[in-house]
A protein has these predicted regions:
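Ubiquitin system architectures
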Residues: 1-81
C-alpha cells in the first residue's frame, strides 16, 4: 500500500505538483499550495476532487480515498469579490 499521495492541483496561479504522506490533512495541503503558488494567504480556499469539495479540512487525504496520483482543483471561496 502506498504511503504517499502525489497531487496535481490546478490553481488560479498555475499547477502545483507535490507529494504528501497519505495522512496529511486537507488544510495542510491547502496551506502548502497557497504558499507555493503565491496566493493570498488571507483568502479562503477549498480543494475539489471530481466536483466534490474535500471537507472537513481536518480529515487526512486517505480518508477521502485519495491514493497514487490525484488531480485536484484549488478554489477560492468567500474572498469577498
Amino acid at each position: 500500500m502506498q504511503e504517499q499521495v502525489t497531487l496535481e492541483v490546478a490553481t488560479p496561479n498555475g499547477v502545483f505538483v507535490g507529494t504528501f504522506p497519505k495522512t496529511t490533512k486537507i488544510e495542510d495541503v491547502i496551506a502548502a499550495v497557497v504558499q507555493d503558488r503565491h496566493l493570498a494567504a488571507g483568502d479562503a480556499f477549498e480543494l475539489v476532487h471530481n466536483g466534490e469539495v474535500l471537507q472537513p479540512v481536518q480529515r487526512p487525504l486517505v480518508s477521502f480515498g485519495l491514493t497514487g496520483s490525484v488531480m485536484l482543483e484549488l478554489v477560492a471561496t468567500g474572498s469577498g469579490v
